[in-house]
Amino acid sequence: MEESMEEEEGGSYEAMMDDQNHNNWEAAVDGFRQPLPPPPPPSSIPAPAREPPGGQLLAVPAVSVDRKGPKEGLPMGPQPPPEANGVIMMLKSCDAAAAVAKAAPAPTASSTININTSTSKFLMNVITIEDYKSTYWPKLDGAIDQLLTQSPGDYIPISYEQIYSCVYKCVCQQHSEQMYSDLIKKITNHLERVSKELQASPPDLYIERFNIALGQYMGALQSIVPLFIYMNKFYIETKLNRDLKDDLIKLFTEHVAEKHIYSLMPLLLEAQSTPFQVTPSTMANIVKGLYTLRPEWVQMAPTLFSKFIPNILPPAVESELSEYAAQDQKFQRELIQNGFTRGDQSRKRAGDELAYNSSSACASSRGYR
């Protein structure tokens, strides 16, 4: 008897739990459907108390309930509104995200060590002002010395890649101002020594030595300016609004050319009056170089500059044609006095005539055979 009662109680409890789970499943499905029509007025059916979200999970008395609906006389609890089901779903998703976050591995010590290592490497690459003065500038100083004193065509045993890298690192470490100051000071000291050597030169070697100094310096600039291109781009052009090449040319003008122009120009005019006292290439290099340094110096000797630089003099005037012809005749007489003859005025040269005659004779002899 007791066993049958226990079985009936167990069966009723299981049926109640099945019905409860079925009702919960139907409520969850109805939450995603379209909302039901509004309930009848409160006068006909009393409004039951609204249960909080999840109230369906609370224990209820064991009552036999049909699976298809409640029995007569037992009111059915209200359906949870869609909003409550949405909140439940959102809470479940948040709980799932929190569970994933908890399951994610915490940052290990190796990642922290890698960050610290990269930071320490960055700090180790910092170039202090002491490092610049003791390591980087001495390399640049030695390379500049070799470039300024090289002769045209000489091989210089320096690494352009190493010098370029030194300049790049110093610019990145904010040493551009100090490097530019050291470069200007270095080249200024070199040009002052060159000027003193020219002052001690005798007159017969003065023009030739000035030509060597000018050509050597201009050739050195073709290597120095590209090596300091980063300093020129990110410091001189942006902060000083100038160009490195213009600054270095100005140094030669101020420290060498301006100090020697009044001694050099009379010697150039004298050499011009005496043909071939100075080679034409030397004369052309000096005149073109002076015009590059300071175009205003053309006014000191317009005739001299006009022989090597076009369009210096004003255009010819018809009234001065006789004067131009007289100058040309004078120049031709000077050439004759120095051993230059006019020679044969025909288009053929003597050697060509002999070669033509011999070839024609050979052809005729072959034809008769």
Swiss-Prot record:
Cell cycle associated protein capable of promoting cell proliferation through the activation of CDK2 at the G1/S phase transition. The keyword Acetylation does not apply. This is CDK2-associated and cullin domain-containing protein 1. PANTHER family: CDK2-ASSOCIATED AND CULLIN DOMAIN-CONTAINING PROTEIN 1. GO terms for biological process: G1/S transition of mitotic cell cycle; positive regulation of cell population proliferation; positive regulation of protein kinase activity; ubiquitin-dependent protein catabolic process. GO terms for molecular function: protein kinase binding; ubiquitin protein ligase binding. It comes from Homo sapiens (Human). Keywords: Cell cycle. Residues 1-56, 342-369 are annotated as: Disordered. Pfam families: Cullin.
